[in-house]
Amino acid sequence: YYASRGLGDVYKRQDKSSFKSDIGYLGQREQTVDINLVVNHYGKSTESEINASGALKDSSSKIFRGTIDFKTGSSDSVGNEKESVLMLGDGVINKTVPLILCAEENVVGNHGATIGELDDETLFYFESRGIGKAEAENILARAAIERLARETGDEETEKLIIKILDEDL
C-alpha cells in the first residue's frame, strides 16, 4: 500500500569519531522498502556500525544497500555492516547489497547477512501452544521492530512504533 524509501549519507571527517545505525523495517502486502545508507570514512581511527533487521510478508519487497567507503586518509578505521531478514511469504523479494570500498591501507571492513524463514520446528512450537501460522509470523515480524523501539530510549517514539505495529499486525 505504500513504498518507503530511506536515503542517507554519513561523513566521518573527524579522527576517532564513530557512527552507529540500527534500522528496522516491516514489508507487507505489496509494499516496497528501499534503503540506501552510505558511510564515508575520511578521518583516522573512525568506526561505523550498520545493523538492519526486519521482516517481509505477503508479496512485499525490499532492497537494502549499505556502503562503507574508506577514503584516503582513513587509516586504522573499522566498519561493520550486518543485516537479518525474516522472509514470511512465498511472494517476497529480498535484495541485500553490501558494499565495502577501500582507498586506504590498514582498515577493517566486515559485512554479513542472515536470511531466514519460519521453519517447521519453530512453527510446531507455536502451534503446540495454540498459536497458528499467521499469528506466529506476526509475532516474529513484530519482535525485531519492538526490540529496536525499546532501544531508542525515547518513550514517545517507542509508543508510536508499538501503536503502528498494533495497527498493522
What do the predicted segments below correspond to?
Residues 72-107:
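A mid-sequence, solvent-exposed acidic-amphipathic segment
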Residues 58-62, 74-76:
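Extended C-terminal subregions enriched in glycine
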Residues 9, 16-18, 36-38, 47-49, ...:
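Detector for repetitive beta-architecture
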Residues 26-27, 35-47, 52-56:
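A glycine- and small/hydrophobic-rich beta-loop-beta segment
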Residues 153-169:
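Long, compositionally biased
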Residues 22, 40-42, 71:
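Feature marks extracellular polysaccharide-active and adherence modules
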Residues 94-151:
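Amphipathic, heptad-repeat alpha-helical segments used for oligomerization and assembly
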Residues 1-11:
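Single conserved hydrophobic/aromatic residue that forms the stacking wall/gate
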